[in-house]
Protein backbone atom coordinates (compact mmCIF):
# COMPACT_ATOMS: atom_id res chain seq x y z
CA UNK A 1 0.00 0.00 0.00
CA UNK A 2 3.00 2.30 0.46
CA UNK A 3 3.48 2.25 -3.31
CA UNK A 4 -0.13 3.28 -3.90
CA UNK A 5 0.22 6.20 -1.51
CA UNK A 6 2.82 7.62 -3.88
CA UNK A 7 -0.11 8.46 -6.19
CA UNK A 8 -1.64 10.74 -3.55
CA UNK A 9 -0.11 14.00 -4.78
CA UNK A 10 -1.20 13.43 -8.37
CA UNK A 11 -4.71 12.42 -7.25
CA UNK A 12 -4.98 15.73 -5.39
CA UNK A 13 -3.81 17.65 -8.45
CA UNK A 14 -6.30 15.86 -10.71
CA UNK A 15 -9.20 16.41 -8.32
CA UNK A 16 -8.39 20.12 -8.12
CA UNK A 17 -9.16 20.35 -11.87
CA UNK A 18 -12.28 18.17 -11.87
CA UNK A 19 -15.96 18.91 -11.35
CA UNK A 20 -16.52 17.37 -7.92
CA UNK A 21 -20.23 16.81 -8.55
CA UNK A 22 -19.68 14.67 -11.63
CA UNK A 23 -16.27 13.14 -10.97
CA UNK A 24 -16.02 9.35 -10.65
CA UNK A 25 -13.27 7.07 -9.44
CA UNK A 26 -13.01 5.73 -12.99
CA UNK A 27 -12.28 9.22 -14.38
CA UNK A 28 -9.50 9.75 -11.87
CA UNK A 29 -8.12 6.25 -12.44
CA UNK A 30 -8.03 6.78 -16.22
CA UNK A 31 -6.33 10.14 -15.70
CA UNK A 32 -3.66 8.48 -13.55
CA UNK A 33 -3.14 5.90 -16.27
CA UNK A 34 -2.72 8.68 -18.84
CA UNK A 35 -0.33 10.77 -16.73
CA UNK A 36 1.97 7.95 -15.63
CA UNK A 37 1.66 5.94 -18.85
CA UNK A 38 1.30 2.73 -16.86
CA UNK A 39 -1.41 0.11 -16.37
CA UNK A 40 -3.30 0.85 -13.15
CA UNK A 41 -6.16 -1.57 -13.83
CA UNK A 42 -4.38 -4.43 -12.06
CA UNK A 43 -4.63 -2.38 -8.85
CA UNK A 44 -8.08 -1.04 -9.66
CA UNK A 45 -9.80 -1.81 -6.34
CA UNK A 46 -6.98 -0.50 -4.19
CA UNK A 47 -6.61 2.66 -6.29
CA UNK A 48 -10.38 3.25 -6.21
CA UNK A 49 -10.28 3.05 -2.43
CA UNK A 50 -7.45 5.60 -2.31
CA UNK A 51 -9.28 7.92 -4.73
CA UNK A 52 -12.50 7.75 -2.69
CA UNK A 53 -10.53 8.60 0.45
CA UNK A 54 -9.11 11.73 -1.17
CA UNK A 55 -12.45 12.63 -2.72
CA UNK A 56 -14.17 12.49 0.67
CA UNK A 57 -11.53 14.82 2.12
CA UNK A 58 -11.95 17.22 -0.80
CA UNK A 59 -15.73 17.42 -0.40
CA UNK A 60 -15.41 18.22 3.31
CA UNK A 61 -13.63 21.51 2.60
CA UNK A 62 -13.54 24.25 -0.07
CA UNK A 63 -11.53 23.17 -3.08
CA UNK A 64 -8.83 25.85 -2.91
CA UNK A 65 -8.25 25.33 0.84
CA UNK A 66 -7.96 21.57 0.40
CA UNK A 67 -5.38 21.72 -2.36
CA UNK A 68 -3.19 24.18 -0.49
CA UNK A 69 -3.27 22.33 2.81
CA UNK A 70 -2.69 18.83 1.46
CA UNK A 71 -0.17 19.56 -1.27
CA UNK A 72 2.02 21.70 0.99
CA UNK A 73 2.75 18.59 3.05
CA UNK A 74 4.23 16.65 0.13
CA UNK A 75 5.52 19.15 -2.38
CA UNK A 76 6.00 22.77 -1.34
CA UNK A 77 7.26 23.89 -4.73
CA UNK A 78 4.33 22.41 -6.63
CA UNK A 79 1.88 23.79 -4.05
CA UNK A 80 3.14 27.34 -4.64
CA UNK A 81 2.56 26.94 -8.38
CA UNK A 82 -0.92 25.57 -7.82
CA UNK A 83 -1.74 28.50 -5.51
CA UNK A 84 -0.90 30.94 -8.30
CA UNK A 85 -2.97 28.96 -10.79
CA UNK A 86 -5.98 28.83 -8.48
CA UNK A 87 -5.83 32.58 -7.85
CA UNK A 88 -5.58 33.42 -11.55
CA UNK A 89 -8.33 30.92 -12.40
CA UNK A 90 -10.74 32.40 -9.85
CA UNK A 91 -10.14 35.95 -11.07
CA UNK A 92 -10.47 35.13 -14.76
CA UNK A 93 -13.49 32.83 -14.52
CA UNK A 94 -15.46 34.85 -11.93
CA UNK A 95 -15.92 31.70 -9.87
CA UNK A 96 -17.95 33.41 -7.15
CA UNK A 97 -20.48 34.74 -9.68
CA UNK A 98 -21.07 31.51 -11.57
CA UNK A 99 -22.87 29.38 -8.96
CA UNK A 100 -26.17 29.52 -10.84
CA UNK A 101 -24.47 28.91 -14.17
CA UNK A 102 -22.64 25.88 -12.75
CA UNK A 103 -25.94 24.17 -11.94
CA UNK A 104 -27.03 24.57 -15.54
CA UNK A 105 -23.74 23.11 -16.71
CA UNK A 106 -24.27 20.02 -14.55
CA UNK A 107 -27.60 19.36 -16.23
CA UNK A 108 -25.99 19.52 -19.65
CA UNK A 109 -23.24 17.13 -18.60
CA UNK A 110 -25.78 14.54 -17.47
CA UNK A 111 -27.27 14.66 -20.96
CA UNK A 112 -23.85 13.97 -22.40
CA UNK A 113 -23.67 17.25 -24.33
CA UNK A 114 -20.87 18.84 -22.33
CA UNK A 115 -17.83 17.17 -20.80
CA UNK A 116 -15.02 18.67 -18.78
CA UNK A 117 -11.50 17.47 -19.45
CA UNK A 118 -10.25 15.57 -16.39
CA UNK A 119 -6.82 17.17 -16.69
CA UNK A 120 -5.97 20.85 -16.92
CA UNK A 121 -5.37 22.14 -20.44
CA UNK A 122 -3.50 25.23 -19.27
CA UNK A 123 -0.09 25.47 -20.94
CA UNK A 124 3.11 26.25 -19.06
CA UNK A 125 6.46 27.57 -20.27
CA UNK A 126 9.27 24.99 -20.25
CA UNK A 127 12.87 25.54 -19.21
CA UNK A 128 15.46 25.59 -22.02
CA UNK A 129 16.68 22.06 -21.27
CA UNK A 130 13.16 20.60 -21.11
CA UNK A 131 12.04 22.51 -24.22
CA UNK A 132 15.10 21.23 -26.08
CA UNK A 133 14.27 17.65 -25.15
CA UNK A 134 10.54 17.81 -25.94
CA UNK A 135 10.74 20.14 -28.95
CA UNK A 136 8.20 22.66 -27.63
CA UNK A 137 8.46 25.83 -25.54
CA UNK A 138 4.93 25.56 -24.13
CA UNK A 139 2.90 22.45 -23.28
CA UNK A 140 0.27 21.34 -20.79
CA UNK A 141 1.62 19.57 -17.72
CA UNK A 142 -0.04 16.35 -18.84
CA UNK A 143 1.58 16.54 -22.27
CA UNK A 144 4.99 17.15 -20.65
CA UNK A 145 4.62 13.96 -18.61
CA UNK A 146 3.32 11.98 -21.58
CA UNK A 147 6.16 13.01 -23.90
CA UNK A 148 8.78 12.49 -21.22
CA UNK A 149 7.56 8.95 -20.59
CA UNK A 150 7.52 8.29 -24.33
CA UNK A 151 11.17 9.40 -24.47
CA UNK A 152 12.09 7.25 -21.46
CA UNK A 153 10.45 4.15 -22.94
CA UNK A 154 11.84 4.76 -26.45
CA UNK A 155 15.39 4.92 -25.07
CA UNK A 156 14.95 2.08 -22.54
CA UNK A 157 15.90 4.27 -19.59
CA UNK A 158 13.98 2.31 -16.93
CA UNK A 159 15.97 0.06 -14.64
CA UNK A 160 15.05 -3.48 -15.79
CA UNK A 161 15.17 -4.69 -12.17
CA UNK A 162 13.09 -1.80 -10.84
CA UNK A 163 10.81 -0.16 -13.41
CA UNK A 164 10.14 2.81 -11.11
CA UNK A 165 13.81 3.86 -11.32
CA UNK A 166 14.89 5.96 -14.30
CA UNK A 167 18.53 5.83 -15.46
CA UNK A 168 18.99 9.11 -17.31
CA UNK A 169 20.97 9.54 -20.52
CA UNK A 170 22.96 12.73 -21.26
CA UNK A 171 19.95 14.76 -22.37
CA UNK A 172 17.68 13.67 -19.54
CA UNK A 173 20.45 14.12 -16.97
CA UNK A 174 20.32 17.88 -17.61
CA UNK A 175 16.76 17.84 -16.31
CA UNK A 176 16.46 15.02 -13.77
CA UNK A 177 20.04 14.28 -12.72
CA UNK A 178 21.82 10.94 -13.16
CA UNK A 179 18.90 8.89 -11.86
CA UNK A 180 15.51 9.34 -10.25
CA UNK A 181 12.25 7.45 -9.71
CA UNK A 182 8.89 7.85 -11.40
CA UNK A 183 7.33 9.75 -8.50
CA UNK A 184 10.27 12.02 -7.66
CA UNK A 185 10.45 12.90 -11.34
CA UNK A 186 7.18 14.86 -11.18
CA UNK A 187 8.47 16.97 -8.29
CA UNK A 188 11.67 17.79 -10.19
CA UNK A 189 9.68 18.72 -13.29
CA UNK A 190 7.89 21.44 -11.32
CA UNK A 191 11.10 23.51 -11.35
CA UNK A 192 11.21 23.28 -15.15
CA UNK A 193 7.68 24.64 -15.72
CA UNK A 194 6.45 28.20 -15.17
CA UNK A 195 3.31 30.14 -16.00
CA UNK A 196 3.61 32.11 -19.28
CA UNK A 197 4.12 35.83 -18.65
CA UNK A 198 1.42 38.27 -19.68
CA UNK A 199 2.40 41.50 -21.44
CA UNK A 200 1.77 43.45 -18.22
CA UNK A 201 4.34 41.28 -16.40
CA UNK A 202 7.11 42.01 -18.91
CA UNK A 203 9.70 44.82 -18.71
CA UNK A 204 8.59 48.09 -20.43
CA UNK A 205 10.80 47.53 -23.51
CA UNK A 206 9.39 44.04 -24.14
CA UNK A 207 5.85 45.33 -23.58
CA UNK A 208 6.42 47.91 -26.33
CA UNK A 209 7.81 45.27 -28.71
CA UNK A 210 4.86 42.95 -28.14
CA UNK A 211 2.35 45.74 -28.66
CA UNK A 212 4.00 46.58 -31.99
CA UNK A 213 3.47 42.96 -33.06
CA UNK A 214 -0.26 43.66 -33.55
CA UNK A 215 -1.52 43.22 -37.16
CA UNK A 216 -0.92 46.26 -39.39
CA UNK A 217 -4.11 47.81 -40.77
CA UNK A 218 -3.89 48.92 -44.41
CA UNK A 219 -4.76 52.47 -45.55
CA UNK A 220 -7.89 51.25 -47.32
CA UNK A 221 -9.06 49.46 -44.18
CA UNK A 222 -8.41 52.60 -42.12
CA UNK A 223 -10.44 54.75 -44.52
CA UNK A 224 -13.27 52.21 -44.47
CA UNK A 225 -13.25 52.30 -40.68
CA UNK A 226 -13.39 56.10 -40.64
CA UNK A 227 -16.31 56.04 -43.02
CA UNK A 228 -18.21 53.79 -40.64
From Swiss-Prot:
GO molecular function, one term: RNA polymerase I cis-regulatory region sequence-specific DNA binding
An annotated GO BP: transcription initiation at RNA polymerase I promoter
SWIB/MDM2 domain: residues covered: 119-195
Ranges where the record places region Disordered: 89-118, 209-228
Keywords recorded for this protein, A-Z: Nucleus, Phosphoprotein, Transcription, Transcription regulation
Post-translational modification Phosphoserine, affected residues: 218, 220, 223
Main location: nucleus
Pfam families given in the database record: DEK_C, SWIB
DEK-C domain location: 1-56
Stored InterPro entries: DEK_C, SWIB_domain, SWIB_MDM2_dom_sf, SWIB_MDM2_domain
Keyword Nucleus found: yes
Biased amino acid composition, Basic and acidic residues: 89-111
One cellular-component annotation, GO: nucleolus
Localization in the cell: Nucleus, Nucleolus
Function noted in UniProt: Nonessential component of the UAF (upstream activation factor) complex which interacts with the upstream element of the RNA polymerase I promoter and forms a stable preinitiation complex. Together with SPT15/TBP UAF seems to stimulate basal transcription to a fully activated level. UAF30 seems to play a role in silencing transcription by RNA polymerase II.
Subunit structure of this chain's protein: Component of the UAF (upstream activation factor) complex which consists of UAF30, RRN5, RRN9, RRN10, and histones H3 and H4.
PANTHER family linked: SWI/SNF-RELATED MATRIX-ASSOCIATED ACTIN-DEPENDENT REGULATOR OF CHROMATIN SUBFAMILY D
Note: Present with 639 molecules/cell in log phase SD medium.
Protein name: Upstream activation factor subunit UAF30
Species: Saccharomyces cerevisiae (strain ATCC 204508 / S288c) (Baker's yeast)
